Each structure stands twice: as C-alpha cells, then as structure tokens.
C-alpha cells in the first residue's frame, strides 16, 4: 500500500484525544487546548493539564506541518530530500507528576513524508516511550519494559531488544555520563517492510503508552512524600532539562527551524532546581538511583 498521510493524521488526532481523556480521568483535572497555525504551512493542537490532583503538568501535543521545501539544516544529512515538498506530523507528550515516587514519562510517535513529481515518496515513522524515575522500584521498571516487549512481539522477536538498546543509547547524558532514566523503546527511520506494517507498529507504540504508565501511577500515587523527596525530584528534573536542551534532536531541530517554541518546550518541568556539586547521602534512596538507572535487561 502506498503511504497514506491522511490516515496517519486521523490516527494521531484520535490518539491525542484518547491519551488526554485517559489522563484526565485518572487525575480529575482537564486539559486546556491551544490551537495554533504555522505561517509556512500547517499547525497543531497543544494541550496542557496543570496543577491537577496527580500531575503537576502534563502536555500532549499534536502537530502537522508541511511545506514546499525542507530547510537546509534538514537536507544537509539527507540530500535525497532536497527539492521535495514535505509533511511531518506527530503526537508528543510528557507527564510530570507531583509525587516524586511517580516517575516522569515521555512518549512520541511521528510520521514524515517527502514527495516530488515523477519520484517515489521518501517516508518513515519514528517514536517510542521512556520512563524517568526519581526513586527506583524494580516492579515498575519491569512492568514498563514488559509492556514494551509485549507490544513489540507480534512484529518480531528482535524488535524489542533492538529498540530497547536504541532507547538506552539515545537517552544518555554524555556530559554527565548517566542515563536519563530506565529507557523503554526508541525507533526512527522505519520504512520496511512496507507502509502498513510500519504504521501498525507505530499505532501499537502509541496505544501502548497508557498501558505501560498508568499502572505505575496507580501503584505510587498514595505514597507519602515530603520536602526531602520533593527537593530531590526538582534536582533530578534538572537532568531532564539538560538532556532536552543539549542532546534531544527533536527539540534542537524544532528550535533551529522556526518551530513553535511554546509547544516545543512544553516538555519542560514547571519547577526545577540545580545545586552545585550536590551529592546524595551514602546509602540513601537518593544515592541508589544512580545504580538503578544503569542499563540492564529488566525482563
């Protein structure tokens, strides 16, 4: 089947609706929608839930941008895209809970297609989801990865280990020499064996996110926390900001190509702190995190 961008867009719009409705039902607060247009072509729907019962901030963004030509920064590494019109669309979300015992989660699914008359379209899917705990609970990481493995299984035995490793490699802070969290799935440039297969996989990842995350939220939301845990959460959120602004390709591409800044930076935590050369107390739960987020096989 030839690539069907309209079909993908309809799925992404439904996915945004479904995730927002599910998160609202769990939290009790509603998302506020901000629809926006891009002068050069396209637009999107940014939805944010703030100061809810469970989530300090949750942002779920849909975007669909298009144009007659790719920016030079995008074609430098992919010369086959030069001179083609393009469409890029996706859903991206980040959830920052109040409770430090609930991890932060991130998910993204996207589709890109570039076309010109007389030539086959160039297209691919990308996406994934990853988990960033502040306090490590093995059963949470195991559930997260088991859900990821199970949704990958129908697409081949090698899919989960391959995309799990890609996620571990991608969400790594080189300047800190540490992982961002316990990983999950990450894939990009997916265009084989055919459109239907790739689209099915992207849908499985998008639909799998809430199954992976919400049982963890339910398990941790009643845990009692205080100033110590909150300060550590804010300190560790600093790593999240550092990764997004220094290493994340999507953030950098969006900012460098004139994307909508408010939507791009919607992933940022609402509050964060840095402290010079801070070290956790030896033997403390805070000190245990650095070992917990080391790359390992969780299942």
From Swiss-Prot:
The active site is at 106 (proton donor). It is an enzyme of class 1 (oxidoreductase). Substrate binds at residues 92, 108-110, 258-260. Its EC number is 1.3.3.3. One of its GO terms (cellular component) is cytoplasm. Involved in the heme biosynthesis. Catalyzes the aerobic oxidative decarboxylation of propionate groups of rings A and B of coproporphyrinogen-III to yield the vinyl groups in protoporphyrinogen-IX. The keyword Metal-binding applies. A divalent metal cation binds at residues 96, 106, 145, 175. Pathway: Porphyrin-containing compound metabolism; protoporphyrin-IX biosynthesis; protoporphyrinogen-IX from coproporphyrinogen-III (O2 route): step 1/1. This is Oxygen-dependent coproporphyrinogen-III oxidase. Its main location: cytoplasm. It is found in: Cytoplasm. Its cofactor is a divalent metal cation. Homodimer. The keyword Cytoplasm applies.
